[in-house]
């Protein structure tokens, strides 16, 4: 297709026609192409108000689909294609990132109970992915592939936990997040976030558990 001729035709189209073409083009793209074309635009956009019950429902559906293997797309790997990442894997991370971002917005709206419910579902799923369950497929994959800033997601999650959980409940949820952070050189500073958002009672219970279980909270380097 001749590029110059195409753009001359496009310049003569109405806004409605261009939007219709853009809509069609979006659905012809794969996940990576959409991120490349529209990613910067989405980062600049203001987040829309999230409907908490819808986010929870979407998170539950995404969890069930993932467990059922909807996004698991294995292929015969060899020396030529080992770096290939299936579209299903790309789509899974994109959907996960969208739901984490939406849950963060729910937390910012001070709907902390609903935010916690969604975050708990998503982080259970992340744990299963990191443990190697057959949810997605690639030679190498991990949480670094989640779009967005995970520290922001965790900040929202932990702040909501602090608002709705007892000291014992708070500690029970935060401890696995602390251990997970230690595996990634404390890149998300989970302990600092947990102390920042906790009440005195929550902080005391958490610190006692950290000491008892001898959990590292910062890098020694």
Predicted regions and their residues:
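Eukaryote-biased, non-catalytic alpha-solenoid scaffold regions
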Residues: 4-8, 16, 23, 27-221
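Residue-level signal for short amphipathic helical patches enriched in basic/charged
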Residues: 13
